[in-house]
């Protein structure tokens, strides 16, 4: 039955003590059928106590009536608990008052049930028992040799074969903090060359285990030292401010190809160069190729900066080339305006970049070659 699951069957015994023989027999049959217990019936409480005194260890459950003429049920419960402390007693009574229930529990009974007992009460009776105690009794019987022979044979066959041959099992030593402390103490006294077992004073430990642990200890020390040195080096790098001065930032500016076709109307940009570190002639050539102009305010100290502008081409202004005779470098300021004729401007740029007509002599005026546009008419 589903309600009887978990009940230890087979080897458990019970006693029923009731002066009403008819009720005692019916209770015995129901316990045997529902719980599968071995039941013994007594109509005399004195005889039941004599049986418990001789075989108290073999009885696991007792059902006793409270209203008995030969001996009161409370007195029977008290004596039975003195004979066998772990015995479990369930009291039966026709009157289940609060006083009766409290008295039974105080004397050590599990529960008080109402007479007469029916099948439902018997089925739920095992729920009030201490199943752990009953299972422990069954385990004790099994250890004494009571049990299924086939089960014992299977358990014997499950052992490893090396135990049948009589070989010893291999044990592993666990280095607890206490053993580690003794190991380090011996290491400080004798050094890494040798560690005496007498100093450690530990049983069940040999030299092989100590040497193996010593190798592991050395590896751990190497790891700690390498980690400490790496951490120290990284801290020095971060704390040294001079290391930051070696960091340089270089920026590369991409400019369009000088021969690519630019739109007719372009935005003019001011192209400033460092006169002290760059050649002015190269700067002029690069400015003409890029279609940009130099800022004249950078060369305000030039004595030739006030020269008149020369008219070239179609009448557009071309700033005269100014030469700084006082310094080692000369300055050239060129202003190019983009006319409607883009091809004409490109032709001027090509002639200037490839021409060698512009000759500059240091300490004197530069010879300026002017570009003149000749008309196709013969009159000019």
Swiss-Prot record:
Region (Disordered): 225-245
Family annotation (InterPro entries): ARR-like (IPR045279), CheY-like_superfamily (IPR011006), Homeodomain-like_sf (IPR009057), Myb_dom_plants (IPR006447), Sig_transdc_resp-reg_receiver (IPR001789)
GO biological process, one term: phosphorelay signal transduction system
SUPFAM superfamilies registered for this protein in UniProt: CheY-like, Homeodomain-like
DNA-binding region: 169-223
Entry's Gene Ontology molecular function annotations: DNA binding
Assigned protein family: Belongs to the ARR family. Type-B subfamily.
Protein name (Swiss-Prot/TrEMBL): Two-component response regulator ORR28
Chain's gene name: RR28
């Amino acid at each position: 039955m589903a309600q009887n699951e978990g009940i230890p069957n087979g080897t458990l015994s019970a006693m029923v003590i009731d002066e009403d023989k008819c009720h005692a027999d019916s209770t015995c049959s129901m316990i045997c059928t529902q719980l599968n217990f071995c039941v013994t019936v007594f109509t005399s409480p004195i005889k039941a106590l004599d049986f418990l005194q001789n075989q108290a260890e073999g009885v696991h459950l007792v059902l006793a009536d409270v209203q008995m003429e030969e001996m009161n049920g409370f007195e029977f419960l008290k004596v039975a608990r003195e004979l066998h402390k772990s015995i479990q007693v369930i009291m039966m009574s026709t009157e289940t008052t609060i006083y009766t229930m409290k008295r039974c529990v105080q004397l050590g009974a599990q529960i008080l049930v109402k007479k007469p007992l029916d099948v439902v009460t018997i089925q739920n009776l095992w729920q009030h028992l201490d199943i752990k105690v009953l299972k422990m009794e069954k385990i004790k019987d099994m250890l004494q040799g009571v049990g299924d022979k086939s089960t014992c044979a299977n358990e014997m066959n499950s052992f490893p074969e090396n135990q049948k041959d009589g070989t010893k099992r291999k044990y592993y030593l666990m280095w607890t903090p206490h053993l580690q402390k003794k190991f380090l103490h011996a290491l400080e006294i004798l050094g890494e060359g040798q560690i005496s077992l007498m100093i450690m004073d530990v049983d069940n430990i040999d030299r092989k285990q100590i040497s193996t642990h010593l190798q592991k200890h050395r590896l751990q020390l190497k790891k700690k030292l390498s980690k400490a040195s790496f951490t120290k080096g990284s801290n020095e790098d971060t704390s040294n401010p001079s290391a930051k001065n070696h960091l340089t930032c270089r920026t590369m500016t991409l400019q369009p190809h000088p021969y690519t076709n630019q739109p007719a109307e372009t935005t003019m940009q001011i192209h400033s160069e460092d006169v002290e570190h760059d050649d002015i002639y190269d700067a002029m050539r690069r400015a003409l190729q890029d279609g940009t102009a130099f800022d004249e305010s950078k060369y305000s100290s030039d004595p030739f900066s006030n020269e008149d502008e020369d008219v070239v081409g179609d009448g557009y202004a071309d700033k005269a080339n100014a030469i700084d005779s006082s310094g080692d470098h000369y300055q050239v300021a060129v202003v190019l305006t983009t006319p409607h004729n883009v091809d004409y401007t490109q032709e001027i740029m090509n002639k200037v970049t490839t021409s060698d007509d512009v000759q500059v002599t240091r300490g004197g005026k530069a010879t300026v070659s002017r570009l003149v546009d000749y008309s196709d008419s013969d009159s000019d």
